[in-house]
């Protein structure tokens, strides 16, 4: 994936990386959180294909946990997407999700590509469905492990455990756009060899380094 020179103009908007990463593969895209790389991939997909990826992993609908008042988040209809909407969706803008939805999606990767409805009752079996080929899920899991060992998620490493996950930062949404305040997110699973836990952590207005 060519991310040179670290920026990409989409209509009247400039997509930026923190620096020029040049040629990277999918693993490198995840390790470096390349917005340019994610945009280039998204623009090669149809609206329906990209929407299907989000929807299969549970975004835009309630998780199935049965918790009263659960938010489905926001996933706009694909028919309204232009190139700019596809670009921003590829790196996490233009939609919203709950921490539970994020954890559920990462649990699906850890579960061999099967999305299972979460439950608050230990030992309860809930419905699940195949959303991704098991081999592809395993490959993505390996990439996410490198995010922890070599990329932006090094602080999530746990001694003697193989951790996989992804960091993220987004500006807070306000009516008509975004403000200059941020939300930081980490989602992941452990241990990679035999995943038992998946979690999503959200930090509102992070401070410090």
What are these regions (language model features)?
Residues 1-207:
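Beta-lactam-recognizing serine transpeptidase/beta-lactamase-like catalytic domain environment
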